[in-house]
Regions:
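Patatin-like phospholipase
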Residues: 1-44, 49-310
Length: 310
């Protein structure tokens, strides 16, 4: 696989971040693929961490030994973490109806005004989170990343329910570290980011990947990694509905880019990666297994590309 013009990195909690970093590291087995040379990065929630590290010039594998400050593994806290993670998608999941009504999430994402109203209403019912993401912000600052024109970080403005794309022209002026914290601020669990009199929370509330933010022209390649695309209806009702929502919305947004002539490749976790991830993407315990599965998936994809090009 050649280096794409744009890399889009979706939400997916602790394990999604690990899978994306590992998969990109595996893809770099291909001599023509260098994730640090793309012209555009779009990061949502956990994907904002990976996007910022790539924009900083760090190799994808550089993050595999580090645990981002998103969760503290403990046996008695897993249910609380899962509930907090799921709440960010609850409104969309209810509309998806656990795959019974596949067109509902498309309507939810594509009608900006209606979608913003639904998000605003849902956020009103969720108390502000208390856990800090300041350590994550410090990690981002230490990477030396800056707004160099390539990076886009997605969050949602809590007051209006609308999407905000930090790094884009006209967006609020905040440091990259603050933008990443905002994009990762799962409502009800993490403390939201406040800037310029507004409050910002997890960008995954708008879309699992926000692939339509990618700035591309006809013929340019967009690579989208969607960690939540592997959550299936066969699992518990809510996580299955999240997976349905994730795949449907990402497909709808990708179609917008394809209509502009872009070439879009979306990668979801394969069967081995999905099995390693399970249904709780904030549980740190299977992280090493997810890394190994992601690396293997990336290397397999790189090998397949090399064989097809031969």
């Amino acid at each position: 696989m050649r280096t794409p013009h744009a890399i889009v990195l979706g939400g997916g909690g602790l394990l999604g971040e690990a899978w994306m970093s590992a998969l990109l590291a595996g893809l770099e087995d291909s001599k023509e693929f260098d994730a640090r040379r793309s012209a555009c990065y779009v990061g949502t929630s956990a994907g904002s961490i990976v996007a910022a590290s790539l924009a900083a010039g760090l190799e994808p594998g550089a993050r595999l030994g580090r645990l981002p400050d998103l969760a503290v593994p403990s046996a008695d806290g897993s249910e609380e973490r899962e509930t907090a993670f799921s709440s960010a998608f609850a409104a969309a999941a209810k509309l998806a109806g656990a795959a019974a009504t596949p067109l509902a999430p498309l309507a939810f994402a594509s009608t900006a005004a209606g979608g913003a109203m639904l998000r605003r209403a849902a956020l009103r019912g969720i108390p502000e989170g208390r856990r800090s993401l300041e350590e994550l912000g410090r990690q981002v600052e230490l990477s030396g990343v800056s707004w160099d024109g390539r990076l886009r970080i997605v969050a949602v403005e809590r007051e209006s329910g609308r999407r905000v794309v930090f790094g884009a022209p006209g967006a609020p002026d905040v440091p990259v570290s603050s933008a990443v914290q905002a994009s990762c601020a799962i409502p009800g669990y993490f403390r939201p980011v406040k800037a310029h009199g507004r409050t910002y929370v997890d960008g995954g509330l708008w879309s699992p990947t926000n692939i339509d933010v990618a700035e591309v022209d006809g013929g340019q390649h967009v690579l989208c990694l969607n960690p939540t695309g592997a959550l299936r209806p066969a699992s518990r009702a809510l996580t299955g509905a999240i997976g349905t929502f994730s795949r449907a919305v990402t497909s709808a947004e990708a179609l917008l880019l394809k209509n502009r002539g872009a070439i879009v490749t979306t990668i979801n976790p394969d069967a081995h990666s999905a099995a390693a991830m399970g249904g709780n993407l904030m549980d740190a315990r299977p992280r090493q297994a997810v890394i190994e599965a992601g690396l293997a998936q990336g290397r397999r994809l790189a090998a397949e590309e090399q064989r097809s090009a031969a």
